[in-house]
């Protein structure tokens, strides 16, 4: 009963916001590169958002075909959109997104880099295909929200990294023990500007409260 109430309350809050926004279509496009060693092409990632009544429909038509090792499956693309949807429209429900999802449709184009078909490689999906799918989701939702003066204060730009530049290295330390490390510079990057003010220089990734680095200057 408690879980159902959380979902129902979240749904009603979402529907109230939808009632304040106009129907329409919003699009955003970005690019990613390096699907494999030696690849110098750019690969397009496109997202279209339709609002029809209380329903939101997301499409990735126009995204580049799956290639190399940077692909993600449908679940990765869907999850990336849910992150932005949660942060921009469900934050007041303590990020309980289940109620809102009753009115969200995901319409993928199979065989694309963020909705890849088997047997595509997905070894770098979290830092490439999923990360690069997240930012257009922020942008199309922000364009939609901008039309309402009261909700406009929730708009924010993407973070300071267009994708996650993962530099991973491993080896043996001076005691002969194995080690591995991932450069975490994007965690200490900037949060983009808000509709009501500047961003945060060392804000990190705003979508998670644990993704932060200390400011050594203070």
Predicted regions and their residues:
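Glycine/proline-enriched, intrinsically flexible loops and inter-domain linkers
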Residues: 1-218
């Amino acid at each position: 009963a408690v879980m159902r109430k959380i979902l129902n309350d979240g749904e009603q809050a979402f529907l109230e916001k939808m009632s304040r926004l106009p129907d329409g279509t919003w699009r955003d496009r970005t690019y990613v590169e390096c699907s494999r060693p030696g690849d110098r092409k750019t690969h397009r990632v496109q997202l279209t958002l339709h609002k029809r009544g209380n329903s939101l429909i997301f499409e990735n038509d126009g995204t580049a075909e799956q290639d190399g090792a940077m692909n993600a499956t449908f679940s990765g693309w869907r999850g990336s959109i849910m992150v932005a949807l949660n942060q921009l429209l469900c934050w007041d429900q303590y990020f309980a997104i289940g109620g809102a999802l009753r009115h969200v449709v995901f319409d993928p184009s199979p065989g694309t880099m963020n909705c890849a078909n088997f047997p595509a490689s997905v070894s770098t999906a979290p830092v490439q295909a999923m990360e690069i799918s997240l930012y257009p989701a922020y942008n199309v939702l922000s364009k939609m929200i901008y039309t309402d003066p009261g909700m406009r204060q929730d708009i924010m730009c993407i973070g300071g990294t267009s994708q996650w530049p993962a530099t991973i290295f491993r080896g043996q330390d001076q005691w002969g023990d194995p080690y591995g490390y991932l450069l975490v510079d994007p965690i200490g990057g900037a949060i983009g500007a808000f509709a009501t003010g500047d961003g945060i220089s060392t804000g990190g990734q705003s979508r998670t409260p644990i993704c932060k680095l200390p400011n050594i200057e203070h």
